[in-house]
Regions:
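C-terminal substrate-binding subdomain of Rossmann-fold SDR/epimerase-dehydratase oxidoreductases
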Residues: 13-18, 22-30, 194-321
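Conserved catalytic-site region of short-chain dehydrogenase/reductase
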Residues: 73, 108-123, 139-145, 157, ...
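Active-site Tyr-X1-5-Lys
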Residues: 135-168, 187-198
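Short-chain dehydrogenase/reductase
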Residues: 84, 88, 136-148, 178-186, ...
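Flexible, glycine-rich beta-alpha linker
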Residues: 114-116, 139, 163-187, 211-212
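Conserved Rossmann-fold NAD(P)-dependent oxidoreductase catalytic core, especially the SDR/UDP-sugar
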Residues: 92-137
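Adenosine-cofactor binding site in Rossmann-like domains, unifying the SAM/SAH pocket
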Residues: 28-53
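NAD(P)H-binding glycine-rich loop region in Rossmannoid oxidoreductase-like domains
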Residues: 48-88, 97-100, 117
Length: 321
């Protein structure tokens, strides 16, 4: 039985990020009254002692791990060590502390890139570790696989409610719009917007445009987390996505239309394509009772509206070696 109730104390690690902030809003809207969070400057989750002290002083009933070193294809390939090591440090500290201090529920967020590059589509949870990973993000993927396995091991050995959710590519309010480190969707919104403002100049996009990606609006992802808080899920690993995908070229044309840009699109073949396709099989979480609501076009319009309101003060994610 699920031991969590509306007054349970819930610590959202990464509560200022795109996903963490959406989870905070969704839990509040669902009636949860005792949410806590710390910024990375208040609590560096790479520091094991600091994490242990914080959890000992707060005694949360639930930890949601939405803190990570996150970035798009270029950031992942240029900073392999940070994507591997920082993510291992953050998640190991949170998972091990949660286990040792008897936190009742732990929700780990991974990513669809944990699955093999050429796994059969749509990707089922049980194709994990059946083949090689996509090279542009294998470092990040290895960290995330380790997190999934750590939660699975704790669940198996100690029968605890530690569960992993694997989101597909996410987008929405509070996304990262920095053109070097962002994912494709926010990058396209910014590029087409700025090109339109500059008199419909050409927009340069990366790769060939042929890879396929699935996109989930962040508020739908947050509802999946609320679902995992509200229910004791019977298995350790669940994919979270829409179950449909588009080519990067189709995404570009949709965003170009939403923004009303009328210039050319140039494809920069020097930039990587990444994995050809990573469509999620989401039947397990759907079967348990969760489903997405926001279609891609609607989500793009919402995100563009958010961008227009906030782009003067957007966060700039800088990575240093
Ligand atoms: N964005 C996407 O497309 C996808 C994301 N995910 C997963 O979802 C989760 C959230 O991602 P998203 O919201 O997009 O990422 P963001 O970059 O928006 O947020 C990440 C958060 O992690 C926190 N953080 C990073 N390093 C540290 C640290 N050393 N100590 C404390 N906090 C730290 C940051 O805190 P602060 O702001 O205080 O610095 C930030 O709030 C991640 O696990 C990611 O892997 C999975 C699939 C796709
Ligand atoms: C969520 C997921 O995100 C990452 O994987 P990815 O899906 O390959 O990342 P992406 O969103 O950055 O790119 C998707 C596609 O889009 C193309 N593309 C075109 N033009 C731009 C462009 O302007 N910017 C970016 N970033 N990509 C572009 C790009 O070449 C690629 O073909 C993982 O590293 C990993 O972190 C992970 O789990």
């Amino acid at each position: 039985m699920n031991s969590i109730h509306k007054q349970s104390k819930i610590y959202i690690a990464g509560h200022r990020g795109m996903v963490g902030s959406a989870v905070w809003r969704a839990l509040e809207a669902d009636g949860y009254t005792n949410l806590i969070g710390k910024t990375s400057s208040e609590l560096d989750l790479r520091n094991q002692d600091a994490v242990s002290e914080f959890i000992a002083s707060e005694h949360p009933n639930v930890i949601i791990d939405a803190a990570a070193r996150v970035g798009g294809i270029l950031a992942n390939s240029e900073f392999p060590y940070q994507f591997l090591m920082e993510n291992l440090q953050i998640q190991n500290n949170l998972i091990d502390t949660a286990h040792k201090q008897n936190v009742e529920k732990f929700i780990f967020l991974g990513s669809s890139c944990i699955y093999p590059k050429l796994a059969p589509q749509p990707l089922k949870e049980d194709c994990l570790l059946t083949d090689s990973l996509e090279p542009t993000n294998e470092w990040y993927a290895i960290a995330k696989i380790t997190g999934v396995k750590a939660c699975e091991a704790i669940r198996k050995q100690y029968n605890k409610d530690f569960v992993s959710l694997m989101p597909t590519n996410l987008y929405g309010s509070f996304d990262n719009f920095d053109l070097n480190t962002s994912h494709v969707l926010p990058a396209m919104l910014r590029k087409f917007h700025e090109a339109k403002e500059n008199g419909n100049t050409p927009v340069t996009l990366w790769g060939s445009g042929t890879p396929m990606r699935e996109f989930l609006y962040v508020d739908d992802m947050a509802q999946a987390v609320v679902f995992a808080v509200n229910n004791k899920l019977p298995e350790h690993l669940y994919n979270v996505g829409t179950g449909t995908d588009v080519t990067i070229k189709e995404l570009a044309e949709t965003i170009q239309n939403v923004i009303g840009h009328q210039g050319d699109i140039i494809w920069d073949s020097e930039k990587p394509d990444g994995t050809p396709r990573k469509l999620m099989d989401v039947s397990k979480l759907k079967g348990a009772g969760w489903k997405y609501e926001i279609e891609l076009l609607q989500g793009i319009k919402k995100t563009y509206a958010w961008f227009l309101e906030h782009h003067a003060s957007l966060k700039q994610v800088k990575l240093s070696k």
